[in-house]
């Protein structure tokens, strides 16, 4: 029996807060207005309905022709901010803003944060460890939390997440612009009928009698489609209910997201993402075979190697000495496979990965018939991001001096920020996409693209330029 080709990716983020006015005033001050949601909107366990806020498609998903003809705010942002020394050496990231919609601009900075976070995780791992994260889920969760942050705590988060860079890029941008764009991004990504399944749940659980501000609850609902629900964290029934909810969303792939909770926990944020996509160019099951995969200079393992032939976009980066292949999913999502030519080249590639580099790859790609060999793999990763985020400069959020007065009048300390994610890549899922050549040599002499050594992968949604998932496969034979 033949099955449609697909890839499964999912991510779960948990943030727990244990026991520390102004959001309404802030929103009023910045003249922020949002459309009201249908009464039953939040009863959906995924944000996949077809509700379209008035005017949003016209404002944030513009074609380049519209950008050039209607609004110079989308064209000359680079002139508004001078690049720093570090950015000058690698190319000012704000230059990527030209010709981009506001949502694409926000996602460029979300990707910059994701690559920095990835590097911290990489430094904590060994070279033989696989890595997998869902950047869109992490950024969304941090955006939600930042609604209630004040003072230096708010500044730290906005600086590390590069939200501050976004606001400084244009006089027309404000802090509340970011939350509005996350709202629109969530709506765009999780609508139906794009040829793939992408589902998300944002749940906010609050210990009974814990005084969460009503304006914070309302803002969570409006901007991030997150419902605040009462919970008794000491009650095993709560864990069972939460796990059942996540089990249903992830189609059984994450069975016990919550093993136990501290009775002192007062707030928990769950962000869960599930993705299932069909490859544009399918991998015939009968072509899968055992193949050598080089772990390092000394070790080789046998893996199940998928094989197909078709038109694929690819490029070669001589500076980073790597090859790039784009595998396209049905519906406007693609996976970039990035493989160093030398086994020793992964460190350099990881150190220099930036949004500028990715855009140059995409612009240098050429389309031709290629034979592709890609190993099947499944990754399951579970991270507590507290120490990771601390090392990146977010410290006050996780200590008693943090200012979360926009969430509660009582002091709150976040002691757990859990990120759990799973990806399954097999014959039932793959993809590819295109652009023009700028400064890179195309893979003109190579007709076979063989992924037989450690590689990186990046999963993007094209219309929003959103980095959904990324990771490193050092050994396809283990999770």
Curated annotation (Swiss-Prot):
Signal peptide span: 1-23
GO BP annotation list: blood coagulation
A GO cellular-component term linked to this record: extracellular space
Glycosylation sites: 31, 168, 367, 403
PROSITE patterns cross-referenced by the UniProt entry: SERPIN (PS00284)
Family: Belongs to the serpin family.
Record note on domains: The N-terminal acidic repeat region mediates, in part, the glycosaminoglycan-accelerated thrombin inhibition.
Official protein name in the record: Heparin cofactor 2
